[in-house]
Amino acid sequence: MLTIKANLRIYHKKGATRRLRKQNKCPAVIYNRGQEPSIPIILNQNDILHPEAVIQLYKNNVILLFIENQQPITVKVQELQYHPFKSKLIHIDFTRV
């Protein structure tokens, strides 16, 4: 099982996500089942683009996210969005398992 560290994302607008990407971070969202609100998070590009991590992301395996000051969350990848010509992720959507 792949484990990734994440931080909560406070700012959600376009300019804030651009600044994150320039800092080698990747914005992501964890979608919950039912009425619970989604959780916006920030991931480090180096943690995600590690060769072992890429394989786990594409296999659609269960991933354990450690978010600061919270219980670990088990998720699956719903969607990956890559930059058109750079080898960077633009955004990831997770679904809680």
Curated annotation (Swiss-Prot):
Biological function: This is one of the proteins that binds to the 5S RNA in the ribosome where it forms part of the central protuberance.
UniProt-listed Gene3D superfamilies: Ribosomal Protein L25, Chain P
Keywords: Ribonucleoprotein, Ribosomal protein, RNA-binding, rRNA-binding
Coiled coil spans: none
GO cellular component, one term: ribosome
One matching Pfam family: Ribosomal_L25p
SUPFAM superfamilies: Ribosomal protein L25-like
GO MF, any single term: 5S rRNA binding
InterPro entries per record: Rbsml_bL25/Gln-tRNA_synth_N, Ribosomal_bL25/Gln-tRNA_synth, Ribosomal_bL25_short, Ribosomal_L25_dom
Regions crossing the membrane: none
Subunit-structure text: Part of the 50S ribosomal subunit; part of the 5S rRNA/L5/L18/L25 subcomplex. Contacts the 5S rRNA. Binds to the 5S rRNA independently of L5 and L18.
Name of the protein: Large ribosomal subunit protein bL25
Family: Belongs to the bacterial ribosomal protein bL25 family.
